[in-house]
């Protein structure tokens, strides 16, 4: 099986200068769509599951599904990642069920709603890093709170999102604090806050530097050139997908996502992992709506799901090609987690923060 840790994959991405989209999964159809896209362009992939996805699909089902995908597509390096873990138990149970990487989001407290202070974030993230590295699993941390610079609010997704009004000091990661955070927590990747948010309704207009602070990414990369940065909430919310949904009975108000060209710019400034969920949902549900309206007599779920899978596959392939991930799968020789654990223990994988 071709399961790979996040650390090894992002190390390779940094060496070769590309980024890796991280696609969220809830079911078999999404998994197949992602892997078909990866096979079509010889790309490694990150598949991630939120706590909501784990509850929806069941940990055992998800674990067996990932085993199956790795067996069906043995040539594709596949990282299975826990998205937005809220405490140590969430992260450790993910590893127990076969995840090769976890995110400990200590920017919020365990309720996934209350913004946490810096010391809390450092303490819990460092504990998860220490435990995960024992077994060779990778850890992503988060510094700063995801949310809109326009509204000062965060968008909840799968029960995860800050409540109340947030100021810019919370919504933008401080570069100097980022250095201290990486040094103290030993994370393998750092999710930063730059004005992006979960869901479809990210921006009320095409984003510029006032509401999408790419300058923050640049500043952090200058201070932490060897740290893998992560952009969350980075769906582009394509106009054509909004139009398909609304043409077939949907009622999505006009909205704007993170432009692909801005993500590509971020990749040049150290962004190695790019979280994408909403775009995949829109690609699939647009086809559900189309088929329901065009063929109202249809009742075979496969007649809905196959076109939806194809649409998501095409979306994923576009992102893999745009981010430079395409053509990289065959260049990677996977390091087993046991060997990664030895490298962590030796200090060889300690972050460079000087």
Curated annotation (Swiss-Prot):
Belongs to the class II fructose-bisphosphate aldolase family. Binds 2 Zn(2+) ions per subunit. One is catalytic and the other provides a structural contribution. The lineage of its organism: Bacteria, Pseudomonadati, Pseudomonadota, Alphaproteobacteria, Rhodobacterales. One of its GO terms (biological process) is reductive pentose-phosphate cycle. Zn(2+) 1 binds at residues 84, 198, 232. Its EC number is 4.1.2.13. Catalyzes the aldol condensation of dihydroxyacetone phosphate (DHAP or glycerone-phosphate) with glyceraldehyde 3-phosphate (G3P) to form fructose 1,6-bisphosphate (FBP) in gluconeogenesis and the reverse reaction in glycolysis. The keyword Lipoprotein does not apply. This is Fructose-bisphosphate aldolase 2. Keywords: Calvin cycle, Glycolysis, Lyase, Metal-binding, Zinc. Homodimer. D-glyceraldehyde 3-phosphate binds at residue 50. InterPro entries: Aldolase_TIM (IPR013785), Class_II_FBP_aldolase (IPR050246), FBA_II (IPR000771), Fruct_bisP_Calv (IPR006412).
């Amino acid at each position: 099986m071709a399961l790979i840790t996040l650390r090894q994959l992002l190390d390779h991405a940094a060496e070769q200068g590309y980024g890796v989209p991280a696609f969220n999964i809830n079911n078999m159809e999404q998994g197949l769509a992602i892997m078909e896209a990866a096979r079509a362009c010889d790309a490694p992939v990150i598949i991630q599951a939120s706590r909501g996805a784990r509850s929806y699909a069941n940990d055992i089902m998800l674990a067996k599904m990932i085993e199956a995908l790795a067996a069906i597509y043995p040539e594709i390096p596949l990282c299975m990642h826990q998205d937005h873990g809220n405490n140590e138990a969430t992260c450790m149970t993910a590893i127990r069920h076969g995840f090769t990487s976890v995110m400990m989001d200590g920017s919020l407290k365990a309720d996934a709603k209350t913004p946490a202070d810096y010391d809390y974030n450092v303490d819990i993230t460092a504990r998860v890093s220490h435990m995960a590295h024992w077994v060779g699993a990778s850890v992503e941390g988060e510094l700063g709170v995801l949310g809109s610079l326009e509204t000062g609010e965060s968008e909840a997704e799968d029960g995860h999102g800050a409540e109340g009004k947030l100021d810019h000091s919370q919504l933008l990661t401080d570069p100097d604090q980022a250095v201290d955070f990486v040094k103290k927590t030993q994370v393998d990747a750092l999710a930063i806050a730059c004005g992006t948010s979960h869901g479809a309704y990210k921006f009320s207009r095409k984003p510029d530097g006032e509401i999408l602070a790419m300058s923050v990414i640049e500043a952090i990369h200058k201070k932490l050139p060897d740290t893998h940065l992560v952009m969350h909430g980075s769906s582009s919310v394509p106009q054509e997908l909004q139009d398909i949904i609304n043409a077939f009975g949907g009622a999505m108000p006009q909205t704007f996502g993170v432009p692909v060209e801005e993500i590509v710019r971020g990749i040049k400034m150290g962004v190695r992992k790019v979280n994408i969920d909403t775009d995949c949902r829109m690609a699939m549900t647009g086809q559900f709506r189309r088929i329901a309206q065009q063929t109202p007599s249809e009742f075979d779920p496969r007649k809905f799901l196959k076109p939806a899978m194809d649409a998501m596959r095409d979306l994923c392939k576009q992102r893999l090609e745009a981010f430079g991930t395409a053509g990289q799968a065959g260049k990677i020789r996977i390091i087993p987690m046991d060997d990664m654990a030895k490298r962590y223990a030796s200090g060889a994988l300690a972050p460079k923060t000087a």
